[in-house]
From Swiss-Prot:
Coiled coil: none annotated. Its EC number is 1.14.19.-. It catalyses: sulochrin + 2 FADH2 + 2 chloride + 2 O2 = dihydrogeodin + 2 FAD + 4 H2O + H(+). Chloride binds at S333, G334. Pathway: Secondary metabolite biosynthesis. It comes from Aspergillus terreus (strain NIH 2624 / FGSC A1156). The lineage of its organism: Eukaryota, Fungi, Dikarya, Ascomycota, Pezizomycotina. FAD binds at G14, A17, E47, V335. This is Sulochrin halogenase gedL. The gene is gedL. Sulochrin halogenase; part of the gene cluster that mediates the biosynthesis of geodin, an intermediate in the biosynthesis of other natural products. The pathway begins with the synthesis of atrochrysone thioester by the polyketide synthase (PKS) gedC. The atrochrysone carboxyl ACP thioesterase gedB then breaks the thioester bond and releases the atrochrysone carboxylic acid from gedC. The atrochrysone carboxylic acid is then converted to atrochrysone which is further transformed into emodinanthrone. Keywords: FAD, Flavoprotein, Monooxygenase, Oxidoreductase. Disulfide bonds: none annotated.
Length: 548
């Protein structure tokens, strides 16, 4: 089949965000075309999945097929931050006893989801690169509302795209809606909006390779076979060791870019393999796993800068996954955030097509949702990386605690992806984000504890938010505002469906996908404003930086 001349929704990019969005829309009987620049299967890094992935796959009936493929089971993850005892995040907390996610070979996992989107009815084409997007002015009744204040932009409405292939074939396709899931290339953000901002505190560089014959981490313990993340002893970065189902161990080092090149220069500018092995000398735990192993691939290197954008939506377009934002992969958040963005894009497009809400409201919901997810991980990652770089200073733990159990207990709903999927208590969610903020010194601990008490109490007494001082409001604007009413329910995408933004909540049901009015009768106007997710922290403006 050749690329059609017209479609309802054009998806750019066949990674997790794009393929998932295409599968969701196709199952809603929406004419969907997916164009992927690379020929699948293609190599990609980012091999460790979060517990939340099961729930996203379950919604599109892909969970059983994905599980049967044979990917390495992941029951949790282990983190060695300094000389204290390792921290372990157990997936049974969100998946039940014996529950697991997976470590995957991304070329195979991404291809599986990409092909599945085609099986569900999407028209999928790999080796087909989108070169340009055509826009028409958008002068709708709500056009003036697409402003930076609403975390939106109005470059016009995209109406067509031109594409090309390596064999010289070219074409043009018209569409009603566009989802940009083009990965780091981010055609909308980088070529047209030019609104991408790099987080200066997270300019890192990654070097990695694959090993055969490595020892198994935690052999004989309940953490046996766990992915292992270990801080470099000099505080310059961290290292991953992720076991894969083909018998290899993925081992990579993430370092601050300036420190990496400084170390390389001091060592006489060694080659990539020698430099990689030099860095591994700073992770005794992982080096021990590699004692009798052999390296079986070239050393790969990539910039690992974290970035975000000022908006992730506009008239008739949505941006999802790495096309919009990327956060340091310490907690393996990439695919999780991609799936959240893909589902949000599909949901908000359907809400408009079904006549449930305006294009402005739907676009704002999506941009707010993407901002919220990125910010939540940003806060937690930066708190932990601050501890990692400070090594034995008491940053996320106190001097008397032997490990990091308290810290990881608080941030668990974030780092397992529970905030968007299975059950999670409001107190734990707010406490986890609050815990991270305290570690940045955004306010005194006393002030933040007092504010936390008010925020937690607000679920029962909305009037409390009207009593916040100007200083407290400033701190609250740095907290991921959420109005969550959590009850014990079946583990699925219930937290995603309970996200109320501007009075709208998602309806995640096959055949009924869209947005619906939520009951906000108990919320005052000020409370609604404070808890809008688009008030999430902007990393650049807030000036959150890690210590040198």
């Amino acid at each position: 089949m050749s690329v059609p001349n017209k479609t309802t929704v054009l998806v750019i990019g066949g990674g997790p965000a794009g393929s998932y969005a295409a599968a969701v829309l196709a199952r809603e009987n929406v004419d969907t075309v997916l164009l992927e620049a690379e020929k699948f299967p293609r190599y990609h890094i980012g091999e460790s999945m979060l517990a939340s992935m099961r729930f996203f796959l379950r919604f599109i009936d892909l969970e059983e097929q994905f599980d049967a493929y044979g990917f390495q089971k992941k029951y949790g993850a282990t983190f060695k931050i300094n000389s204290k005892r390792e921290a372990y995040t157990d997936f049974s907390a969100s998946l039940g006893p014996g529950g697991y996610a997976w470590n995957v070979i991304r070329s195979e996992a991404d291809d599986l989801i990409f092909r599945y989107a085609g099986e569900q009815g999407a028209h999928i084409f790999d080796g087909t690169k989108v070169d340009d997007i055509e826009f028409l002015s958008y002068d709708g009744a709500d056009g003036a509302n697409f402003t930076p204040a609403a975390f939106l932009v109005n470059p016009g409405r995209p109406v067509a795209a031109t594409w090309s292939r390596k064999d010289g074939t070219r074409g043009r396709i018209k569409f009603d809606y566009l989802i940009d899931a083009s990965g780091r290339a981010g055609i909308i953000s980088t070529k047209y909006l030019k609104n991408r901002t790099v987080n200066e505190g997270l300019r890192n560089i990654a070097n990695w390779s694959y090993w055969k014959g490595a020892k198994v981490y935690g052999e004989g313990s309940d953490q046996q076979g766990s992915p292992f993340f270990e801080a470099l002893t000099d505080g310059s970065g961290w290292c991953w060791a992720i076991p894969l189902h083909n018998g290899t161990l993925s081992v990579g080092v993430v370092m601050r870019q300036d420190l990496f090149f400084g170390k390389k220069k001091a060592a006489g500018s060694p080659g990539s393999l020698e430099m990689y092995k030099l860095c591994l000398q700073s992770v005794p735990g992982i080096s021990g796993l590699l004692e009798d192993a052999e390296i079986v691939s070239d050393v790969k290197m990539a910039s690992d800068w974290s970035y975000s954008a000022s908006a992730y939506a506009g008239p008739h377009f949505r941006v999802a996954g790495d096309a919009g934002c990327f956060i340091d992969p310490y907690f393996s958040s990439g695919v999780h955030l991609a799936l959240v963005g893909g589902l949000s894009a599909a949901t908000t497009i359907q809400a408009v097509r079904r006549g449930e809400t305006s294009e402005f409201s739907a676009a704002k919901w999506h941009s707010s949702k993407v901002t919220e997810g990125y910010t939540r991980f940003l806060l937690v990652v930066m708190a932990v990386l601050r501890q990692l770089r400070k090594q034995n200073a008491a940053v996320i733990t106190d001097d008397k605690e032997e490990g990091f159990d308290t810290a990881f207990g608080l941030i668990q709903p974030v780092i397992q992806g529970q905030a968007d999927t299975g059950e999670s208590e409001q107190q734990r969610m707010v406490a986890g984000v609050q815990f991270s903020l305290e570690r940045f010194g955004q306010a005194t601990p006393e002030a933040q504890r007092a504010l936390l008490d008010k925020v937690q109490f607000a679920g029962q007494n909305a009037e409390e938010l009207e009593k916040l001082t100007a200083d407290e409001l400033a701190v609250l604007h740095n907290i991921i505002g959420r109005q969550l009413k959590m009850t014990k329910v079946e583990k699925n995408l219930d937290n995603f469906t309970r996200d109320v933004i501007d009075g709208w909540a998602p309806r995640v049901e096959r055949g009924k996908l869209g947005l619906q009015r939520a009951d906000t009768s108990i919320m005052t106007a000020e409370m609604k404003d404070l808890f809008q997710l688009n008030r999430s922290l902007d990393s650049t403006k807030a000036g959150i930086q890690l210590p040198a």
